[in-house]
C-alpha cells in the first residue's frame, strides 16, 4: 500500500489543491502546513502551466500569476523538498504533460521521489498513452493517478482501474474546475458505476465549494478534492485565517 492510498484507510480523505507560487512562494510554504494542521490528508501541488485546459478561471489566474513569479517545474520540486521537512501527509503533483515531458520523464520522477512527492496527476494524459511516464514512475516508487468523468465509457473505466495507483480522481461534471453552487444529481450513480470495477479509493473533485457538498459526496465516495475555493480564500485573505476555518468546516463535515 502506498502513502497515498494509506491516507484513505482511517477516514474520508480531504484532498486540497493549491497552485505552487500563488500568490507567492512564501504563501505556499505557509499554506501547506496550515492545511495539514486543520485536517487535510493529501496535498495536491499544482505545477503552473500557460494553457491549463482542464481548469476554470480561478486556477487559470493562479497559474498565470505563478508563472509571472517565475515558478517552473524545478521551482516546484524545490518547494516540495522544503515542505517535506514541514509536513507528514503525502504530496501529489498535479500538472500538464508538456512541461513534465520537456523536463524529462525519468529525471522528473526521480526528483519527485527525492523531494518527497508520492505521485502525480496529469489531466491531459490519457492512460493509454502513459506507458513511458508510468514506467519511470514505477521505477521511482511513485503513484500515477488517472481521472474519470461521468462521460467515461466502461472500457475507459476498466483501463483506469488497471492503471491508476493511489486513488482514482473522479471528475464530478464535464467541463473545467471551479467552485460551483450545484453538483450533478446523478453523481452517486457515476461513483457507484466506477466502484463496480475499481478497487482503488475514489475521490471526487471539480466544483466542491461548501461543507454541505462535501458531506453529501462523502456518503458515496472515499474522499473529496477542493481547490478553487481555497485559492479564492487565499486571494481575499492573505492572513489565511479564512482558509483555516474553511478546511476545519470541511473536515468536520467528513468526520
UniProtKB/Swiss-Prot annotation:
Metabolic or biological pathway:
Amino-acid biosynthesis; L-tryptophan biosynthesis; L-tryptophan from chorismate: step 5/5
Show the Pfam families listed in the entry: Trp_syntA
Highest taxon, organism lineage: Bacteria
Write out the GO MF terms: tryptophan synthase activity
Q: Which reaction does it catalyse?
A: (1S,2R)-1-C-(indol-3-yl)glycerol 3-phosphate + L-serine = D-glyceraldehyde 3-phosphate + L-tryptophan + H2O
Question: What Gene3D superfamilies does the annotation carry?
Answer: Aldolase class I
Which residue spans adopt a coiled-coil conformation according to this UniProt entry?
none
Q: Name one GO cellular component term.
A: cytosol
Does this entry carry the keyword Lyase? yes
Q: Catalytic site residues?
A: 44, 55
Q: Does the keyword Disulfide bond apply?
A: no
Quaternary context? Tetramer of two alpha and two beta chains.
Q: In which family does this protein belong, per the annotation?
A: Belongs to the TrpA family.
Q: What function does the entry list? A: The alpha subunit is responsible for the aldol cleavage of indoleglycerol phosphate to indole and glyceraldehyde 3-phosphate.
Q: Which HAMAP family match?
A: Trp_synth_alpha
* The protein's name: Tryptophan synthase alpha chain
Organism encoding this protein: Dehalococcoides mccartyi (strain ATCC BAA-2100 / JCM 16839 / KCTC 5957 / BAV1)
Amino acid at each position: 500500500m502506498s502513502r497515498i492510498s494509506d491516507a484513505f484507510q482511517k477516514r474520508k480523505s480531504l484532498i486540497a489543491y493549491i497552485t505552487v507560487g500563488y500568490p507567492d512562494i512564501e504563501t505556499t510554504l505557509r499554506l501547506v502546513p496550515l492545511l495539514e494542521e486543520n485536517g487535510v490528508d493529501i496535498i495536491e501541488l499544482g505545477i503552473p502551466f500557460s494553457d491549463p485546459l482542464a481548469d476554470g478561471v480561478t486556477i487559470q489566474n493562479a497559474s498565470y500569476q505563478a508563472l509571472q513569479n517565475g515558478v517552473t517545474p524545478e521551482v516546484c520540486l524545490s518547494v516540495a523538498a522544503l515542505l517535506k521537512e514541514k509536513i507528514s501527509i503525502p504530496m501529489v503533483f498535479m500538472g500538464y504533460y508538456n512541461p513534465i515531458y520537456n523536463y524529462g520523464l525519468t529525471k522528473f520522477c526521480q526528483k519527485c521521489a527525492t523531494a518527497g512527492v508520492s505521485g502525480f496527476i496529469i489531466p491531459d494524459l490519457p492512460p493509454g498513452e502513459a506507458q513511458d511516464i508510468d514506467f519511470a514512475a514505477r521505477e521511482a516508487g511513485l503513484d500515477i493517478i488517472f481521472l474519470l468523468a461521468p462521460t467515461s465509457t466502461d472500457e475507459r473505466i476498466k483501463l483506469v482501474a488497471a492503471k491508476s495507483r493511489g486513488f482514482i480522481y473522479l471528475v464530478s461534471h464535464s467541463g473545467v474546475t471551479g467552485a460551483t453552487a450545484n453538483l450533478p444529481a446523478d453523481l452517486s450513480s457515476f461513483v457507484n458505476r466506477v466502484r463496480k470495477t475499481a478497487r482503488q479509493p475514489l475521490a471526487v473533485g471539480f466544483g466542491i465549494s461548501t461543507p454541505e457538498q462535501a458531506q453529501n459526496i462523502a456518503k458515496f465516495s472515499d474522499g473529496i478534492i477542493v481547490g478553487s475555493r481555497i485559492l479564492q480564500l487565499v486571494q481575499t485573505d492573505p492572513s489565511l485565517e479564512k482558509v483555516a476555518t474553511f478546511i476545519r468546516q470541511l473536515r468536520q463535515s467528513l468526520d
